Amino acid sequence: MVPRVMSTQHPDNARIPFFAASEVLNGEDEVREAYYVFSHFKCDEQMWDFEGKEADAHIVRKLLSSYYDFFSSRPLGKDFRLTMRVPNPEIEKGEAKLLAETLEMIPRSYDYVRSLGIEHPPIFEVILPMTRSAEEVMKVHAFYRDFVAGKGRFELLGEKVSDWLGDFLPEEIKVIPLFEDRDSLMRAAEISERYAEWAELDELRVFLARSDPAMNYGFVAATIYVKKALYDLSQLGISTYPILGVGSCPFRGGFSPKNLSVLDEFPSVYTFTVQSAFKYDYEFGDVRRAIKRAKEAARRKSDYVDEEHLQVAEKLKDGYRRRIAKIAEIVNRISSRIPRRRMRKLHVGLFGYSRGEEIKLPRAITFCASLYSIGLPSEIIGIAEMSDKDYEAVCEVFKNFDGMMESAMSLFNPESLKIVDLSMDFERAKELFGYEPDERHLEKTNEIIKQIDGDIKNLVVEAGILRGFLG
């Protein structure tokens, strides 16, 4: 059974999880989290992330040794999935050999569960981030098959390696391509089809990012690009099971226990991610009910995206990117005081600016948290470029556009315009979607603005709790 709900480790939560030893989750906290995700939240998949962070390579052993009664009757790989996100050696040269190290986990973990009498591989899929070609996916698949599992066929001093170290199983894995930029999203179907043909697969899981495209191209353009990729995938001659990476912040997808419209917005998506804010910034009962709804959601045909929709996306993307230079200074000024929620390696993204400049910005969660903390929702950036005709075209393909924008606008603080002049964007957004501020959030962001160069960490968290997400 293909999972419907994938829990992830994205650090977008304002509240501290009930099982955490401190406000920054460490490796042991994340092992506990994986158990609670399956046992309490009833998710059917947990992403185990080796990209950009130190992850515990002994996760399978630790889960079974600590929670044997639970997992012995509900085996990993069968009732629940643990799916690793591995580094992409084509992009992350400094982490290239970590790919080999993480793939070695797979047969080692299988050995451990077999020693307990469980005859099912706990891990048999990996996610490849920043996929840009079919060859990248094929290389990971072939490397595991030929050099990880395949080493058992080699001979050492006249003896097969498998006779010495045991079998290396499973013999093959599947690789889930993760598409994160515009060009790869536009080629997602082509790349997926080539990989499926090469690997002789009749079905394939494909992962589409929503957060990084929004960071690079803006809220509306990212949504249209993802919808175009989903439509193209639906036209393939193989069964595809798309995964959509969505956060609770509208800019990053808008999926929360209080907003399940995303299930209808992307009707062909099979698996939705639930990130940390979804799990920890809402009442437990609401989270459980929302996850149940997501697991039961009926799939329908993808929305058709035509050339007019893509032209509007390009226009709004260009408007968004023109404004990034004036936003970067305040984002970087505030970002260092956004509280950390996970033990991650420092990672500063490079935003490719349209005139060849490179503007340094933090990752998407911190970017959004920095702007929301002063009452500047990132969803409005560039919206002044939207004509009435553009608006009508967007509403054709983005069904809950008004609802998402009204939600974002409720968190706007006009005082933020004194820090970053986006007055034209605000006025156009107000004209299209109205402006009814959340008074409690307005008050909290006023406090942050008054103390903007001081110790604002607690205020940032308090504002995040009111929103239902940090960033």
From Swiss-Prot:
<dbReference type="GO" id="GO:0015977">
    <property type="term" value="P:carbon fixation"/>
</dbReference>
<protein>
    <recommendedName>
        <fullName>Phosphoenolpyruvate carboxylase</fullName>
        <ecNumber>4.1.1.31</ecNumber>
    </recommendedName>
</protein>
<keyword id="KW-0460">Magnesium</keyword>
<dbReference type="GO" id="GO:0008964">
    <property type="term" value="F:phosphoenolpyruvate carboxylase activity"/>
</dbReference>
<dbReference type="Pfam" id="PF14010">
    <property type="entry name" value="PEPcase_2"/>
</dbReference>
<keyword id="KW-0120">Carbon dioxide fixation</keyword>
<keyword id="KW-0456">Lyase</keyword>
<dbReference type="InterPro" id="IPR007566">
    <property type="entry name" value="PEP_COase_arc-type"/>
</dbReference>
<dbReference type="GO" id="GO:0006099">
    <property type="term" value="P:tricarboxylic acid cycle"/>
</dbReference>
<dbReference type="InterPro" id="IPR015813">
    <property type="entry name" value="Pyrv/PenolPyrv_kinase-like_dom"/>
</dbReference>
<comment type="similarity">
    <text>Belongs to the PEPCase type 2 family.</text>
</comment>
<comment type="function">
    <text>Catalyzes the irreversible beta-carboxylation of phosphoenolpyruvate (PEP) to form oxaloacetate (OAA), a four-carbon dicarboxylic acid source for the tricarboxylic acid cycle.</text>
</comment>
<comment type="subunit">
    <text>Homotetramer.</text>
</comment>
<dbReference type="GO" id="GO:0006107">
    <property type="term" value="P:oxaloacetate metabolic process"/>
</dbReference>
<dbReference type="GO" id="GO:0000287">
    <property type="term" value="F:magnesium ion binding"/>
</dbReference>
